[in-house]
Amino acid sequence: MNNFILLEEQLIKKSQQKRRTSPSNFKVRFFVLTKASLAYFEDRHGKKRTLKGSIELSRIKCVEIVKSDISIPCHYKYPFQVVHDNYLLYVFAPDRESRQRWVLALKEETRNNNSLVPKYHPNFWMDGKWRCCSQLEKLATGCAQYDPTKNASKKPLPPTPEDNRRPLWEPEETVVIALYDYQTNDPQELALRRNEEYCLLDSSEIHWWRVQDRNGHEGYVPSSYLVEKSPNNLETYEWYNKSISRDKAEKLLLDTGKEGAFMVRDSRTAGTYTVSVFTKAVVSENNPCIKHYHIKETNDNPKRYYVAEKYVFDSIPLLINYHQHNGGGLVTRLRYPVCFGRQKAPVTAGLRYGKWVIDPSELTFVQEIGSGQFGLVHLGYWLNKDKVAIKTIREGAMSEEDFIEEAEVMMKLSHPKLVQLYGVCLEQAPICLVFEFMEHGCLSDYLRTQRGLFAAETLLGMCLDVCEGMAYLEEACVIHRDLAARNCLVGENQVIKVSDFGMTRFVLDDQYTSSTGTKFPVKWASPEVFSFSRYSSKSDVWSFGVLMWEVFSEGKIPYENRSNSEVVEDISTGFRLYKPRLASTHVYQIMNHCWKERPEDRPAFSRLLRQLAEIAESGL
């Protein structure tokens, strides 16, 4: 009876890494579930199956699906976990139904075990910590309640003959909420309605997720339009601003002029938050101010939250709700939520799912707005509705074959502080590159035309924007090679985005690519670049220091009247740019750290981002 086979199927397992030196790999195995054990075999064609491992069902402590937003590194994308003894087995099923069958069957057979855990970890153990709760011990107590009876003894109903769509979502499935509307006529995609809930079916692609609506319709949608439904996820609330500097927060609140206008924003310490509120009560009616309150956490498990010690709450939304109705120790009641950037949907990685080659007939050219290394830039529209920037590539200006090989990869680089490449037109000469349109043009021109109007805090915010984009490229192992204010663009609300990353690889003009060429940007180049053409993320850091200098000098040319050869000689003898008038001592110190002689002595962009955020939060 104990050998009766309940389920059998080919699945993929991740190594359990029972020893510290064990490799982390994935193996295809033939799994067999009986009343006594869960066994897995190596299944080689034409040969007898070889038993590779077996777990007694009586030793199982937990069986549950794994909810995660990471890209699954094997071709089966539906993970579940089997916790037994002191080990953790991750198994990957080919589809949702297969995973459901295995989890239900295993739960049914183990729900009366004596060793079941009260709590489990719903996300992966990766890189030395739990992704769900950031605990650093692999055997740490879980962070979510485990219910061994949930869905056990319950089989999903088959679809009715006239309706083959999926049934409504199972409780274990990840539910996401749309932050924005999304309209589409593409049969592969699904339209989104703001604040509606959807079931996440597949998140293996970073920028486009497959979801299901409440009517059972499925399709791909931009992942940046969605947020996971969770009591502690703040992104669905109109008062939350994820990435905004203290200076920008103060400007927005002052612009409202309303007593009690407020927002919740990320603090400089990851995972902590600040409430910023406008008031006229502290100083005078004619001299209002912004008060900042750090949201503090108790040492309880689970944590609780407070601003004033007398009023402690189980979640941040509950805390905000209370203070919207009661002052409770704050200078004023939280009356008017202020949100930055939520009115406009974020750009997507590609104009449509899987679409990176654009038909020229879909583009309308409106007017020429500039020229660059590759050719002319036009304002235009895609399908007469989406405003875009169209770069027409001059014949002989770039290595087109090399670029086309890289274009699809470059399109997948997507971040709020990068100018998005939407696609390319290849069907006619010259080829065109279609980019996100940025309202106010390049940063260097913007700084010069507005010179004398900038506060130092605003300039620091510009540097922070660029640093955010560069930290993303650094993590993605992408080298810009030509970072400068001329290659950053200014959008609405003075948001700065990095443009033309990696494009110099495709330039054919030797005067631009050779360090001896008259067009080579020596004034932004590190010593190892102009001496040996050695590009790296650390050579980008040097260029970022020069860009900071450009920003705080409001668009001046670095080294001003010096020739390229004189600049090379100056830098080689230890000369560095002077401190701009608007740069504080702390800001200038960061510039000098970027200009260290040896690349390894320069900070990473991730570190620069933390340092600049600290200065922005504490004041220049």
Curated annotation (Swiss-Prot):
Residues 239-338 form the SH2 domain. Zn(2+) binds at residues 121, 132-133, 143. Its EC number is 2.7.10.2. Keywords: Adaptive immunity, ATP-binding, Cytoplasm, Disease variant, Immunity, Kinase, Metal-binding, Nucleotide-binding, Nucleus, Phosphoprotein, SH2 domain, SH3 domain, Transferase, Tyrosine-protein kinase, Ubl conjugation, Zinc, Zinc-finger. It catalyses: L-tyrosyl-[protein] + ATP = O-phospho-L-tyrosyl-[protein] + ADP + H(+). The modification Phosphoserine is found at residue 565. Residues 4-111 form the PH domain. One of its GO terms (biological process) is T cell receptor signaling pathway. It comes from the Eukaryota. ATP binds at residues 369-377, 391. GO terms for molecular function: ATP binding; non-membrane spanning protein tyrosine kinase activity; zinc ion binding. GO terms for cellular component: cell-cell junction; cytosol; nucleus; plasma membrane. It is an enzyme of class 2 (transferase). Residues 171-231 form the SH3 domain. Phosphorylated at Tyr-512 in the activation loop of the kinase domain by LCK. Subsequent autophosphorylation at Tyr-180 leads to the kinase activation. The autophosphorylated Tyr-180 lies within the substrate binding sequence of the SH3 domain. Ubiquitinated. Binds 1 zinc ion per subunit. Induction: Through a myriad of surface receptors including the TCR/CD3 signaling complex, coreceptors, or chemokine receptors. It is linked to Lymphoproliferative syndrome 1: A rare immunodeficiency characterized by extreme susceptibility to infection with Epstein-Barr virus (EBV). Inadequate immune response to EBV can have a fatal outcome. Clinical features include splenomegaly, lymphadenopathy, anemia, thrombocytopenia, pancytopenia, recurrent infections. There is an increased risk for lymphoma. Homooligomerizes; this association negatively regulates kinase activity. Interacts with PPIA/CYPA; this interaction regulates TCR signal strength via a proline-directed conformational switch in ITK. Interacts with THEMIS. Interacts with FASLG. Interacts with VAV1; this interaction is important for VAV1 localization and TCR-induced actin polarization. Interacts with TBX21. The N-terminal PH domain allows ITK to be recruited to the plasma membrane by an activated PI3 kinase. This domain also contains a proline-rich region (PRR). The adjoining domain is a SH3 domain, which binds to PRR (from itself or from other proteins). Next, a SH2 domain is required for binding tyrosine-phosphorylated substrates. In the C-terminal region, the kinase domain is required for tyrosine phosphorylation. This is Tyrosine-protein kinase ITK/TSK. It comes from Homo sapiens (Human). The gene is ITK.
